[in-house]
Amino acid sequence: MTETELFKEGLNLMFSGMGFVIIFLLILIWAIGIVSKLINTFFPEPIPVAQAKKTVTPTQSAVVDDIERLRPVIVAAIAHHRRTQGLN
């Protein structure tokens, strides 16, 4: 075989292989779409129930009170840490 014949044979093999791969991928995409539709037909996703909006409750304002109540404790803890680590 000459170089030209080998080159033609290589191109033929390359395009045949690429064609088979593209056809296989298209069939795979088609099959995945069909399986997806079948699964959604037999096992539909539940429709989410709308929940009522929550109103502001006294417990939410208690969170702010907790932060204000803990502020001196946090300041004391930072001061103690700085004192023991020699950062001051």
UniProtKB/Swiss-Prot annotation:
UniProt-listed InterPro entries: Na_pump_deCOase, OadG
Catalytic activity: oxaloacetate + 2 Na(+)(in) + H(+) = pyruvate + 2 Na(+)(out) + CO2
Pfam families on file: OAD_gamma
Location of the protein in the cell: Cell membrane
Broadest EC class assigned to this enzyme: translocase
Keywords, alphabetical: Cell membrane, Ion transport, Membrane, Sodium, Sodium transport, Translocase, Transmembrane, Transmembrane helix, Transport
UniProt membrane topology term: Single-pass membrane protein
Enzyme Commission no: 7.2.4.2
Gene Ontology CC terms: plasma membrane
Cofactor(s) required, per the database record: Na(+)
Source organism, top-level taxon: Bacteria
Membrane-spanning residues: 13-35
Any GO molecular function: sodium ion transmembrane transporter activity
GO BP terms, alphabetized: sodium ion export across plasma membrane
KW NADP (keyword) present: no
Quaternary structure and partners: Heterotrimer of an alpha, a beta and a gamma subunit.
Function: Catalyzes the decarboxylation of oxaloacetate coupled to Na(+) translocation.
Family (UniProt): Belongs to the OadG family.
Name of this protein: Probable oxaloacetate decarboxylase gamma chain
Lineage, highest ranks first: Bacteria, Pseudomonadati, Pseudomonadota, Gammaproteobacteria, Pasteurellales
Gene this chain is encoded by: oadG
